[in-house]
Structure formats: structure tokens, C-alpha cells
Amino acid sequence: VKKLGAVVTGFEIGPQAEKYSNEFGIDVINDYFKASHLDKKVDCIFSSGCLEHIIDLNDFMKQSFKALEKGGLFFASVPNALPDFEKGSVSHLCHEHINYFTIQNSTRFLRKCGFTNCGSSTNSVGNEIFLWGYKPLKKNRNISERNELAEFEQELDYLRSYDKALKSNLSKEISALQSLVNDSNKKIGFYGGGATISYLANIQEHSRFFDGDEAKWGNKWMPGLSEIEDP
């Protein structure tokens, strides 16, 4: 985007802020996103792999709405939760995302936040959702509730099905992990997480943890676990 002539400001709460600033030659603010950090309103806010981790998502969206010029674009990329809901994925839950998105609820969420001309689509393999909306040029007084009840009921059906499949799959996965530990003297390696399932299976002492993020190396997901390693 910078190469196309845009003035870019980034936000990063981790220690990578300075590294990214130097690497990409842009201003990176080492703090949570707040409209007050910006000198003026912006034309576009882009978020990738972020919304699913934010505890107070409503406040983040309020800050984003406030920071945008009228007609400005909010664009985000988030994991698509639906495939994992449908297959009862244990790892999906243990990854500990706070917010879970589908095509239906992502668009509905943006409308609730006051954005207009909202849309969403998946990437070619269906594991990521791209969602977008625009800050209205005029105050949007009437947000359509059309079809939202039906969409909400569908979301509840997804969650009920996920709960049923998850209970079955979790028991099988715990048994499989415990069998691997009992049948050998080797440890089990987890990449990008694994803390929750290792506790549930009671195999903490037989687990190693890896992550591609250098900032995490030497730290621990939770007390009592081994340090996170360079894969």
C-alpha cells in the first residue's frame, strides 16, 4: 500500500513494533489501536488476523469507526470458523480465539457497528474470511434487521452441532495423545499452541511447544509447561 503512495501507520502491541517499523519503513505505534493516536482521520483501516484475538471488540470497532473519514473503508481478514464448527475440530477451540466469525455473522457484525455496504467472502480454500464495510457519508439512522433473526438461529444451530461433535472428538483426541505417551518414551510436539489440550490430556511433562514467532521463544504458554522453542 505504501508503494502505491499511501501514508501508512501501523499498530503493534508486541516487541516486534520497532522491527516492523525498520523493516518496512513505516511508522509503527507500539500500543493498542486508538483513534487518539492518529493526527487526523484516515481513509482505510486494514486488519489481518487480529479481530479474533481482541477481548473488547466493540471498543475496537468504535475506535475504528471514529478514526475513519466519512466514506472510509474498514477491511479485515479473519479465520473462517464454519469449517471447524462443522467437523467438530478440537484444535480450533484449543487455539483460544476469543471471537469466531462466519460469513453471516461477520457482515451482520459490521452492520451493527454502523458500517454500510458491508460484505464478506472467503479465500479460495475457504479458511479465511475477508469482510468490509464503509463509514456512511451521513448518519445511518435505520439499520435493517431483515433476516437477522434467521441468521442468528442458524448460528445457534452451528454451535449446537459443534458442541455435539466436539464432545466426541475431544475424548478421542485425549485418548490418542495419552496412548502415544504411554507407548513410547518420546515427547509430543505442538506447533502454535497446544497448552490447553496438553493439560486436558494430562501430558504436560511429555510435551514440547514450538512457534514461528521469535518473540515467543523462551517464554511459556502457561506456568508448568516447557518453554516455547524455535521450530
Where do the language-model regions lie?
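Short glycine-enriched, charge-decorated loop/helix-capping segments at active-site entrances
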Residues: V90-E96
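Conserved catalytic loop of SAM-dependent methyltransferase domains
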Residues: H92, S120-K139
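Aromatic-acidic/polar surface patches that form glycan- and anion
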Residues: N99, T122, L170
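Conserved short-loop catalytic and cofactor-binding motifs
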Residues: S48, C94, S161, A165
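A glycine-rich phosphate-binding loop feature that marks nucleotide/adenosyl-phosphate handling sites
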Residues: N80, N123-N127, F190-T196
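Generic recognition of flexible, low-complexity loop/linker segments
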Residues: K34, C118-S120, A176-L180
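Conserved SAM-binding loop
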Residues: V1-G88, Y100-C118, G133, G194-Y199, ...
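Hydrophobic, well-ordered beta-alpha structural blocks that scaffold small-molecule cofactor pockets
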Residues: W132-P231
